[in-house]
Each structure stands twice: as structure tokens, then as C-alpha cells.
Amino acid sequence: MTSQTSSESQVPVILVATDFSETADSALDWAAELARQQGARLEMVHAVTVPPVLPWYPPPNSLNFSEELRKAAESRLAETRAMLAGKGVEVSTFLDVGTPSQVIVQRAESLAARAIVIGTRGLTGLRHLLLGSTTQRVVHAARCPVLAVHPADAGGHRPIRTILVPTDFSQDAELALTTAHHLLSYLEQDARLILLHAYNLPIEYTAYGPIPTSVSYLEDAGLEAERRLFEMAEALKRDGLTVETVARQGDPAHVIAEEAQKRGADLITMGTHGHSGLRHLFLGSTAERVVEQAPCPVMTIRQPEE
């Protein structure tokens, strides 16, 4: 573990999680660029997870085993830190034993981190369950923005020219738009922002199959979405931003991922919710599905709890 000086504690922190994978290396590149843009210091976090003892294997000496894992992780952190130093990137390190998502979120809260950057493999099935669940848990639990970087983004940070901001016109979406606006202030003047709204039938309608009123409902929803997107875009254009709008019918997560691919988005920023249980199922799952499906990094921003 590393200690903070009083001067360090006054500088904003970008926290990057690593498991020493290729995707984590790409997350490091994105985190370093984000820290450079915002004048923040970079901290690299790794959690040592002691595998559960299986009944058909003799249990190792848990204390020695944990210490061996810790030493190996410290060595890898030192190697990565030296590699980054060779590129002119300064980074502090933090190591702890525990569940990765808990270690990451707790460390971010203790530092009041400006953002967490983490790699996600975007896999399905058992491999996703084992390898991708940490990212999903961090997205759901973190109070600060979380930037999830995908395997397709491996090979380094690329310039951000297009930011896609999905909106459902809620406070969560407004916070994500504010974050995107802030990020654009650090980017080249030719950067653009795309506002996207995906509308669909309420779940109550879909339970009954096709009904006549569904057609007029969708038409009205599309027109209302276009009107509200136009108003939002005009306000942003007055701030000197280049803005485009898209209103489309369909499943939100699918539409967001498809439009990001179609329009060459370099980053998606979107709101998420800190709910649990049934409310999380309906309100938080869209952001988590986008993190899995999107063709580019996704920054999720959680509305502060009242």
C-alpha cells in the first residue's frame, strides 16, 4: 500500500483497477490520458483474491498462501509502475486482499476518486460470470463515474472525437450529459456530441400483444422525443458544441450499442441507478447491458443518493 502526502490528497484522483490482463493494460492507457487531461493523479489498484479451498484438494497454509499471492502481486504492480514511468506516466499503487469489486469501490470512496477506470471482457456464459462480474458490480456500486474499457479497445487510448449520450430525460441522464459536456471541454474543437433517445412500448402494453393504440403511442413518443432532443441540442449549441440528435424505437440497450457502432462513437456516457432488488432490475440493467454490448468504452454516472 502507499500513503498519501497532504499535497497529494488535494489533487483529484483517477483510480484504475488492474488484473494484469491485456484489457486492464488498455484501461491503464485510458486512465492515464484521463488523468493527464484533468490534472489528476493516477492510482493503480489490485485486489488479491484467495481461491476457495476445494474439498478434493488438501488445503494450503492459508497465511503463507495469501502472503505468496500478495508478494507476487506486489511484484507485478512494481513492474507495471516501472513500465508506465518509462512512458512518463507517474502512478501510485494500492494492494489489498479481498473481493475485487469491494476493494475497488472502497478505495475509490476513501480517496473521493473522480472516476474509476476498469477493463471488462464483455464475455458471456461461465467465463463472463467469472471474469466480467467484477466490472458489473463496480458499475452498480460505485458512487463516482466508472469508465469500462472493452477488449476491442485494447492497444491503447484513441482520441475522443464523438461522445454518445443516451437520455431518457431523467435526472440521471442529465448528470451524464453534464459529464460529457465537461469532457468535451478537454477535447479538440472538432469533437461532437450525439444525443440519443430510445423509446418503446411500456411493458404493460407488450403483455397484450399488438393493439391499435400501440401505433399512435409510438408515433406520439417519437415526436415528443424529437422535440425534447431538439431543445436540448439547441441549448448545447449555444455553448459552442457540435450536437446531433437521434430518436429511435427499440430496446434501449440494443439501440445504444447499435448507434454507437453506426456513428463511430469513441465513448458513451450514460446515467445509472444505485438501486437494488426489483428497482435495479428495471432501472439499472440497461446501463449494465450497454457496458457488455457497446463497441467502445462506456462511462456510467450514478445519481447521488438523497
Predicted regions and their residues:
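Small/aliphatic-rich secondary-structure junction motif
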Residues: 2-61, 87, 159-213, 235, ...
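Conserved beta-strand segments of alpha/beta enzyme cores
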Residues: 90-92, 145, 192, 242-244, ...
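Structural motif
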Residues: 45, 94-96, 126-129, 149, ...
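Gly/Ser-rich helix-loop-strand patches that form or flank binding pockets
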Residues: 1-12, 33-37, 101-156, 258-306
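Conserved residues at beta->alpha junctions
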Residues: 18, 95, 120, 167, ...
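Structural beta-alpha unit
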Residues: 1-10, 23, 30, 60, ...
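A short acidic, glycine-rich active-site loop
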Residues: 62-75, 213-227
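Hydrophobic alpha-helical membrane-association signature
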Residues: 27, 73-76, 176, 225-228, ...
